């Protein structure tokens, strides 16, 4: 077949280019990089000139080349040089050595070996060729192999065809697999197989990693996110994904010199936040590195040949991860049902300074600032703490932080406490705490004050300009924080700036002091002993007081109730206002209104508080924003007819004020919703998110540009049809590739396809092309699309900032709704049988008739035995509680404390009647455990905690002491217990419940003639031949239990029978011995009195009475 004729369709599929074409630049795998037809023509001309020069050079060297071509397959087209010779341009095929010396990279040895047998197949070497010609042959051969890739790659190369111009992100996905510079020439360190230079993308990753060595980096590479090096190993372990082996270190360590790439692991783009959440939950700090350029805009820019620009865009830890969409939806029912521990999400900053003393006399001044990024709440405090660090522990247990930032060095005692609470998953928080550290300069106080002042300077200007007195006072309060608190605040602002969340500190309205004396103090021991937030078995919420009272329907309501439980009120008026609101909500006359509110709360499926703060941060997604605004609109419209508190239908000021605040946001919400295209927002369509009238000029411009390009593409159909001899062609879309022109291979039109058309794909029947005009227009359209996406994101960010201006009014409405949720929850508890409204008094007393333990009652299948309590600061201030082991002593004293706490929360209490005074604190000393980290024994812990109670307790406190003195010998234990009890009653005068097995202490009642101390015991009945088998009655009665019946507990614990019998025998012997000794002492006392009755004083008589009672 003549070379000038049209090739067959089969020849179109497989054609062999010229050798010189392998030395020219390859077309890139993107639409933007495909050359136009003019450039292609120039390149072909250059190829012909180069071949001609080479042939002339060969003739001069005397070399000849065989004209025989190995062309076994008839569908392979002859090379360009042969076509040129046929046309009469040259008579011989000779190759000239080029004059310009090109610096070529040597090929890998394996590539040379693969093609050794097939090189120069069509021109066998001449015997007399010179060394220079041999070198030239080898150089050309290496060029040929490098460009072609191997002897079999000629198959499938067609005329003017190019691979589909896939988006550059796909290429970026394999950036680390790009061919790297091969090793040096043969014989030079070829043993280091795989050693190579770093790719541009790997250099980017290393540069970012060196700045964030403590961070697990997730790098966007095309359509995947990838982990490299040690981060890949971490991700594989935590996420259970595959880690491809390679280098783990980022410092080019010699031990990994034999490896040619980094270890890697990958995750899909759409699963990014799922895996990030799992990593931060495991305690890791995670950074997301994103591509900052798009394919279309990059191709049009000046850096088209450089790698994609990448930047660390997000940093996450457990406390700063606010992009969790799962936590925004759903009610509290599932959490309450499982009893799982609810993390508060606080990040706490702590610093301390030693003020005086050392050892047991040590005093430290501590400052804390805690922020909850998910809600915007901020807590601060400065306080002095003793060597037991009970104050720090109290705040840590109340706040339950998930992260702790330590500024400067802590003392050993504080360091041990923080490490103990954060270092294991079985602590009171139920999870590990992430601990970070920040340096503290000697001039930290001055620097921190300057930093905080400059941070709030802009806000101060705005406040002064608007003459907002309330905002000004709040801001002034923040600026006047104590020295230690200011250091913490400054450190937290810097720390949160790293995560882009520092704006949370601009919300000065939500700063709260921790140690406000408007709340009852519940320290760490009390929280644990009374199981306020977590049970002591598995540290879950099930079985805790919070679990008992939690009937909330929303997440933000649940968080508010948690604060109420941990901070019972001291203000009698505020307390009565809250309990009156609960009473009204359970009133049958308000059933319809209460059901309306319950129904409204039940329809709220999102965490409004978290969504609002995400809007404030500018991180809210479009569907989430639509849900937020629609939910706020639903809430406001539910009470749209309420103009004032008097219109609500409730008489309680607390309820009516909360309801009246809800419709005030309706106008702003509707104004924002009117700007949104609901359908597009629901589908997260950024291009149509705004209504047409609300679109910015930039968005409109690029939309018009896209429309113009698509119009030109439509017009181009006629032009393409004329070329193919048709009236008009139709575009087809295959595998996501648009605007393809399909031409049947057997039709006459295939012969009319210009060489400038790029073949994209095809089958046996059809070939599909892109014309140069289509390629140009698609490039324009992609640029417009990328610019449109950037414009839409910019307009959305501006819209979020506009909504943020109404943040405080929206937040206040959500807080009002949370208050209603909490009150309805307490009303639900109050509707349970056996609950009563407590009566409050300013006099310190606890008078409860038929009281019950609120948690045990719900967990027990059997009915709970109720008991009375009557403590009064002017009458009986203390009860000495005795009774057998497992007789219910601890449950009884816990019941008293829990009823007092519930009453001051504003809840109904489980009793027939209750009169409660305003207690300022509840202190407990229960259980026996040592503190190995501090080197303290069980008895040392007992006495240290008791000492703290004696220092902090007031006449308005309730103190519970359980078996004080059991950690040492009987004589010392009795002496200490007696001294402490006496001091509590006479000096401190607080309400006291004292549990003991020391029956000798019962004689103390004679020291208090006004009955400040009473003896009570837990009733039981004896049975069996030896009266060792007892039945617990769990009733509290006057008197003393003279035996503890420990052998009965041993029997219940299934100790071996012989062991119990031996213990019983020894117990009887010891009891008889003590009985005889007491009897002998009584006889001696009587003898002394009878011998000299005149000298018998009052103390001798008291000793006689005491000895008689002990018998």
Curated annotation (Swiss-Prot):
GO terms for biological process: mismatch repair; mitotic recombination. ATP binds at residues 883-890. Residues 192-319 are annotated as: Mispair-binding domain. Residues 1-36, 86-96, 110-125 have a biased composition (Polar residues). Disulfide bonds: none annotated. Keywords: ATP-binding, DNA damage, DNA repair, DNA-binding, Nucleotide-binding, Nucleus. GO terms for cellular component: nucleus. GO terms for molecular function: ATP binding; ATP-dependent DNA damage sensor activity; mismatched DNA binding. Residues 1-141, 155-197 are annotated as: Disordered. Signal peptide: none annotated. Residues 50-59, 97-107, 128-141 have a biased composition (Basic and acidic residues). It is found in: Nucleus. Residues 166-179 have a biased composition (Acidic residues). Component of the post-replicative DNA mismatch repair system (MMR). Heterodimerizes with msh2 to form MutS beta, which binds to DNA mismatches thereby initiating DNA repair. Msh3 provides substrate-binding and substrate specificity to the complex. When bound, the MutS beta heterodimer bends the DNA helix and shields approximately 20 base pairs. Acts mainly to repair insertion-deletion loops (IDLs) from 2 to 13 nucleotides in size, but can also repair base-base and single insertion-deletion mismatches that occur during replication. Heterodimer consisting of msh2-msh3 (MutS beta). Forms a ternary complex with MutL alpha (mlh1-pms1). NCBIfam families: PRK05399.1. Belongs to the DNA mismatch repair MutS family. MSH3 subfamily. This is DNA mismatch repair protein msh3. It comes from Aspergillus oryzae (strain ATCC 42149 / RIB 40) (Yellow koji mold). The gene is msh3.
């Amino acid at each position: 077949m003549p070379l000038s004729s049209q090739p067959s369709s089969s020849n179109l599929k497989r054609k062999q280019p010229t050798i010189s074409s392998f030395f020219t630049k390859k077309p890139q795998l993107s639409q933007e990089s495909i050359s136009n037809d003019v450039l292609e023509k120039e390149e072909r001309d250059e190829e012909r000139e180069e071949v001609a020069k080479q042939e002339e050079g060969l003739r001069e060297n005397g070399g000849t080349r065989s004209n025989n071509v190995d062309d076994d397959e008839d569908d392979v087209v002859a090379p360009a040089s042969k076509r040129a010779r046929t046309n009469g341009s040259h008579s011989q095929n000779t190759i000239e050595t080029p004059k310009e010396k090109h610096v070529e990279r040597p090929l890998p040895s394996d590539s040379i070996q693969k093609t050794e047998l097939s090189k120069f197949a069509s021109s066998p070497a001449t015997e007399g060729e010179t060394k220079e010609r041999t070198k030239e042959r080898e150089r050309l051969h290496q060029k040929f192999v490098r460009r072609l890739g191997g002897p079999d790659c000629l198959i499938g190369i067609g005329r003017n065809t190019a691979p589909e111009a896939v988006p550059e992100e796909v290429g970026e996905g394999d950036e680390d697999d790009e061919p790297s510079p091969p090793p040096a020439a043969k014989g030079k360190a070829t043993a280091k197989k795989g050693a190579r230079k770093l790719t541009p993308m790997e250099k980017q990753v290393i540069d970012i990693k060196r700045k964030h060595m403590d961070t697990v980096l997730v790098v966007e590479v095309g359509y995947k996110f990838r982990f490299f090096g040690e981060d890949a190993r971490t991700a594989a372990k935590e996420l259970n994904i595959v880690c491809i082996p390679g280098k783990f270190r980022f410092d080019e360590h010699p031990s990994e010199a034999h490896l040619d790439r980094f270890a890697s692991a990958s995750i899909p783009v759409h699963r990014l936040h799922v895996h990030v959440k799992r990593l931060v939950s495991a305690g890791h700090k995670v950074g997301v590195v994103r591509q900052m350029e798009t394919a279309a805009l990059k191709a049009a820019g000046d850096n088209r040949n450089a790698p994609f620009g990448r930047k660390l865009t997000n940093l996450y830890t457990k406390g700063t991860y606010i992009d969790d969409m799962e936590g925004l939806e759903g009610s509290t029912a599932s959490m309450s049902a499982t009893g799982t521990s609810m993390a508060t999400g606080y990040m706490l900053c702590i610093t301390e300074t030693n003020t005086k003393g050392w050892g047991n006399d040590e005093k430290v001044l501590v400052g804390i600032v805690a922020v909850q990024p998910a809600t915007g709440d901020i807590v601060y405090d400065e306080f002095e703490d003793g060597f037991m660090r009970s104050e720090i522990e109290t705040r840590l247990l109340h706040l339950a932080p998930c992260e702790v930032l330590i500024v400067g060095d802590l003392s050993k005692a504080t360091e041990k406490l923080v490490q103990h609470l954060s270092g294991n998953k079985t602590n009171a928080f139920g999870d590990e705490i992430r601990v970070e550290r920040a340096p503290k300069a000697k001039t930290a106080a001055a620097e921190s004050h300057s930093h905080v002042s400059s941070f709030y300077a802009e806000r101060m200007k705005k406040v002064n300009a608007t003459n907002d007195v309330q905002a000004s006072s709040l801001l002034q309060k923040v600026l006047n924080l104590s020295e230690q608190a200011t250091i913490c605040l400054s450190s937290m602002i810097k720390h949160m700036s790293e995560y882009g969340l520092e704006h949370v500190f601009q919300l000065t309205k939500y700063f709260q002091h921790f140690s406000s004396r408007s709340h009852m103090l519940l320290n760490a021991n009390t929280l644990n002993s009374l199981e306020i937030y977590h049970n002591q078995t598995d540290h879950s919420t099930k079985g805790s007081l919070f679990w008992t009272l939690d009937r909330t329907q929303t997440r933000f309501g649940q968080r508010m109730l948690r604060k109420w439980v941990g901070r019972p009120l001291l203000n009698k008026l505020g307390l009565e206002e809250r309990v009156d609101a609960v009473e009204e909500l359970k009133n049958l006359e308000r059933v319809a209104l209460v059901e309306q509110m319950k129904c409204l709360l039940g329809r709220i499926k999102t965490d409004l508080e978290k969504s609002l703060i995400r809007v404030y941060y500018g991180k809210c997604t479009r569907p989430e924003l639509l849900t937020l605004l629609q939910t706020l609109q639903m809430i406001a419209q539910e009470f749209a007819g309420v103009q004032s508190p008097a219109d609500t239908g409730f008489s309680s000021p607390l309820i009516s004020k909360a309801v009246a605040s809800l419709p005030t946001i309706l106008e702003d919400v509707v104004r924002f919703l009117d700007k949104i295209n609901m359908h597009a927002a629901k589908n997260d369509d950024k291009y149509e998110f705004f209504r047409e009238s609300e679109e910015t000029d930039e968005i409109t411009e690029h939309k018009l540009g896209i429309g113009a390009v698509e119009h030109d593409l439509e017009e181009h159909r006629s032009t393409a049809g004329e070329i193919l001899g048709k009236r008009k062609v139709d575009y087809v879309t295959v595998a996501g590739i648009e605007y393809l022109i399909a031409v049947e291979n057997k039709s006459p039109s295939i012969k009319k396809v210009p060489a400038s058309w790029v073949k994209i794909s095809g089958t046996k029947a059809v070939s599909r092309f892109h014309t140069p005009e289509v390629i140009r227009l698609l490039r324009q359209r992609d640029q417009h699309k990328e610019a449109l996406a950037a414009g839409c994101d910019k307009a959305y960010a501006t819209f979020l900032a506009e909504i943020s201006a109404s943040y405080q009014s929206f937040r206040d409405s959500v807080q009002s709704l949370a208050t209603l949720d909490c009150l309805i929850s307490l009303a639900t508890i109050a509707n349970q049988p056996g609950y009563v409204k407590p009566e409050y008094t300013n006099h310190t007393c606890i008078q409860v008739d038929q009281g019950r333990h609120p948690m045990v009652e719900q967990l027990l299948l059997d009915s709970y035995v109720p008991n009375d309590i009557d403590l009064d600061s002017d009458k009986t201030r203390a009860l000495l509680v005795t009774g057998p082991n497992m007789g219910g002593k601890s449950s009884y004293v816990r019941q008293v404390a829990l009823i007092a706490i519930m009453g001051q929360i504003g809840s109904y209490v489980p009793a027939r009647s209750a009169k409660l005074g305003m207690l300022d604190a509840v202190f407990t000393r229960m259980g026996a455990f040592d503190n190995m980290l501090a080197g303290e024994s069980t008895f040392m812990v007992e006495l240290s905690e008791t000492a703290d109670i004696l220092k902090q307790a007031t006449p308005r406190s309730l103190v519970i002491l359980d078996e004080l003195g059991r950690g040492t010998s009987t004589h010392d234990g009795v002496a200490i217990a007696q001294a402490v009890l006496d001091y509590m009653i006479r000096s401190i005068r607080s309400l006291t419940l004292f549990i003991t097995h020391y029956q000798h202490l019962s004689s103390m009642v004679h020291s208090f003639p006004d009955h400040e101390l009473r003896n009570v015991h837990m009733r039981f009945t004896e049975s069996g031949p030896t009266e060792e088998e007892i039945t617990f009655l769990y009733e509290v009665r006057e008197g003393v239990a003279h035996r503890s019946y420990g052998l009965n507990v041993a029997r219940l614990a299934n100790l071996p029978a012989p062991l119990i019998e031996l213990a019983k025998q020894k117990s009887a012997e010891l009891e008889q011995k003590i009985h005889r000794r007491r009897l002998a002492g009584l006889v001696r006392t009587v003898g002394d009195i009878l011998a000299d009755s005149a000298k018998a004083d009052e103390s001798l008589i008291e000793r006689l009475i005491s000895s008689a009672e002990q018998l």
